[in-house]
């Protein structure tokens, strides 16, 4: 004798309630919480032959109220030296995409045409994880409400710390890494502010209590816009020194008049603490006008080159003509997990972001550097010799006048300065090193505003020295890099074996982090479903006992429940072994093993002469002739 209709309805109602409850409880995890696997890049259009590098990319929401989302592109290190390191790279502008850095400077790939990628020898991902971030909101692939674009540097830094907190929640196995920030141009304002925000965050009680301190270990800034008070006045001596402007001419007198007006503004107390001074911007515009010959003018990013007037460098570097169409391809957008509904197409520099981000209430980042250095944070500043817009004379004047740790500039003792040491790389003069009290300065000979574009191998050597990478214990072919004729720590710019011991330590760290990653990615739903199943089993058992005398054998065979139901499928997901934490979501064969010889064979771009690129196809507001060229053109404020 079976259940009566009322009892059947009661049991079915109970089952429906439990099923609804389980679905409701799992919904937030399965829909809103993303895992590292959701960001995994399975393939990259145009990728070269050989195994695909391990990458993750996509958007992370930093402000639900304003729909603020920052885009990131992460490359895992190809080899591990003595310990794991992560380098965060930022381009400047403000409003210029860090994909410039990824595809034209320090990333592992460069475009050889609009459709084909090639490996870059000297890329920075050899011994360090690379994290490229389009920030602030509105830059590159990042998006959000235009009404809430950032205006000040502390606001930008706060948003970036929020981004990192959310990023480490998704990728917890990278949180213990030694953390470095690197970038160029207007990132000379970004990076010190972000560093200050991180150090302040690390002192908070909840961070200390939860062991979430980030191991910030150093900053690298190339051709940085850091100190307007020293860098605006450097335009005139630089163009005289390089022979760009001939003194005594009517045009030169006009430039000198604008420089004098700028100096007057700099001496006004209200302007000494500002990042942007319009009257001082006129100096650069006057120089560009001076070089206007026919339809050409000097390239403000590399004075060895010319460009169409009035772009004057905006069409450079030549790779730019391929980068934009590549990043606008639908298959690339899909591969990088970009929200197509929120994007109108990648643009190198967002004019709207630059227009909003004037930092009128922010003090220049140079005022933060002494405190950072005194707290023990190593900082490296490097300059390309042939850059005009953020030239090396301005950077050197800034260092000379900066006071920290009981000294001024590179003083070793009162009146005694650290020597300028001559650097050679593979037998060629490469530049100058100078250092004291946690600050290092490197001048690259014959280099532009984008030094890694010109010399990827030399900048990688600089990076490895700064990070303290030493390949002595893991073997490899060392680079011949000498400072004042002496070799320092053994570095290698190219292929070499991995460190087995370090790899094992990294694997153990990944395994430890695996549960945390799964928990945040929605696998906690397994616990909920399991609990519901146990409760349902108890309900069945009690029902059986209650109705044994009625010949009860099963409940609703039409539901098709058996011992290998959904819980069996969840268990199968966890049977993939102890590989990568995203193993359930992609083919591990793409990642395991050492790179093939084809993968390790890449071409060098050192020493090449680059032709001026074609006219930029950016679709935002272009520059108009006349004043404030840098602030109205496609590169935002021009300091990318």
Swiss-Prot record:
Reaction equations catalysed: Preferential release of a C-terminal arginine or lysine residue
GO terms for cellular component: membrane; trans-Golgi network
Gene from which the chain derives: KEX1
Sorted UniProt keywords: Apoptosis, Carboxypeptidase, Glycoprotein, Golgi apparatus, Hydrolase, Membrane, Protease, Signal, Transmembrane, Transmembrane helix
Family from the record: Belongs to the peptidase S10 family.
Gene3D superfamilies registered for this protein in UniProt: alpha/beta hydrolase
UniProt-recorded name of the protein: Pheromone-processing carboxypeptidase KEX1
Stretches of the chain found on the membrane's Cytoplasmic side: 542-640
GO molecular function, one term: serine-type carboxypeptidase activity
Organism: Paracoccidioides lutzii (strain ATCC MYA-826 / Pb01) (Paracoccidioides brasiliensis)
InterPro entries xref list: AB_hydrolase_fold, Peptidase_S10
């Amino acid at each position: 004798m079976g259940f009566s209709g009322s009892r059947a309805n009661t049991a079915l109602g109970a089952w429906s309630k439990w099923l609804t409850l389980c679905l409701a409880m799992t919904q937030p995890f399965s829909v809103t919480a993303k895992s590292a696997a959701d960001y995994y890049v399975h393939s990259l259009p145009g990728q070269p032959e050989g195994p695909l590098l391990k990458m993750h990319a996509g958007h992370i929401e930093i402000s639900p109220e304003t729909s603020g989302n920052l885009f990131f592109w992460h490359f895992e290190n190809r080899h591990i030296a003595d310990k794991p390191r992560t380098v965060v790279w930022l381009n400047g502008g403000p409003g210029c995409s860090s994909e410039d850095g990824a595809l034209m400077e320090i990333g592992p790939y460069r475009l050889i045409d609009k459709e084909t990628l090639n490996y870059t020898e000297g890329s920075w991902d050899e011994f360090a994880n690379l994290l490229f971030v389009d920030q602030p909101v509105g830059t590159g692939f990042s998006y959000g409400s235009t009404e809430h674009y950032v205006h000040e540097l502390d606001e930008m830094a706060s948003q970036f710390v929020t981004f990192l907190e959310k990023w480490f929640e998704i990728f917890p196995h990278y949180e213990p890494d030694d953390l470095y920030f690197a970038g160029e141009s207007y990132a000379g304002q970004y990076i010190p502010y972000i560093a200050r925000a991180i150090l302040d965050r690390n002192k908070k009680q909840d961070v200390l209590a939860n062991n979430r301190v980030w191991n910030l270990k150093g900053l690298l800034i190339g051709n940085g816009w850091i100190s307007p008070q020293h860098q605006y006045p450097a335009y005139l001596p630089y163009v005289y020194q390089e022979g760009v402007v001939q003194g005594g001419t009517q045009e030169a007198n006009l430039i000198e008049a604008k420089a004098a007006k700028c100096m007057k503004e700099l001496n006004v107390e209200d302007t000494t603490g500002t990042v942007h001074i319009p009257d001082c911007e006129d100096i650069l515009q006057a120089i560009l006008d001076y070089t206007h010959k026919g339809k050409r003018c000097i390239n403000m990013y590399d004075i060895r080159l010319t460009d169409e007037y009035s772009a004057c460098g905006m069409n450079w570097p030549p790779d730019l003509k391929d980068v934009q169409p590549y990043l606008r391809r639908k298959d690339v957008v899909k591969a990088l997990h970009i929200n197509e509904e929120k994007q109108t197409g990648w643009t190198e520099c967002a004019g709207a972001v630059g227009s909003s981000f004037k930092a009128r209430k922010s003090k220049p980042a140079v005022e933060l550097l002494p405190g950072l250095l005194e707290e023990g944070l190593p900082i490296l500043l490097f300059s390309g010799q042939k850059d005009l817009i953020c030239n090396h004379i301005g950077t050197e004047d800034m260092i000379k006048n900066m006071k920290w740790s009981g000294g001024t500039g590179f003083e070793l003792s009162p009146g005694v300065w650290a020597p300028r040491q001559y650097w050679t790389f593979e037998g060629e003069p490469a530049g100058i090193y100078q250092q004291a009290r946690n600050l290092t300065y490197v001048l690259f000979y014959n280099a532009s505003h984008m030094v890694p574009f010109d010399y990827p191998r030399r900048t990688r050597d600089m990076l490895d020295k700064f990070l303290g990478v030493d390949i002595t214990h893991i073997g490899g072919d060392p680079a011949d890099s000498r400072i004042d004729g002496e070799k320092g720590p053994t570095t290698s710019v190219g292929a070499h074996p991995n460190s087995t011991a370090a790899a094992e330590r990294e694997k153990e760290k990944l395994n430890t982090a695996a549960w945390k990653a799964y928990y945040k990615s929605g696998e906690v739903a397994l616990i909920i479903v399991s609990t519901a199943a146990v409760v349902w089993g108890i309900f069945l058992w009690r029902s059986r006992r209650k109705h044994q005398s009625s010949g009860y054998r099963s409940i609703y065979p039409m539901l098709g429940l058996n011992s290998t139901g959904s819980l069996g499928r969840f268990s199968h997901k966890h049977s993939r072994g102890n590989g990568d934490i995203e193993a359930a979501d992609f083919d591990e064969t793409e990642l395991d093993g050492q790179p093939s010889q084809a993968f390790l064979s890449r071409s060098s771009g050192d020493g090449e002469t680059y032709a001026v690129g074609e006219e930029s196809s950016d679709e935002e507001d272009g520059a108009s002739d006349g004043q404030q060229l840098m602030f109205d053109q496609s590169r935002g404020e021009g300091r990318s």
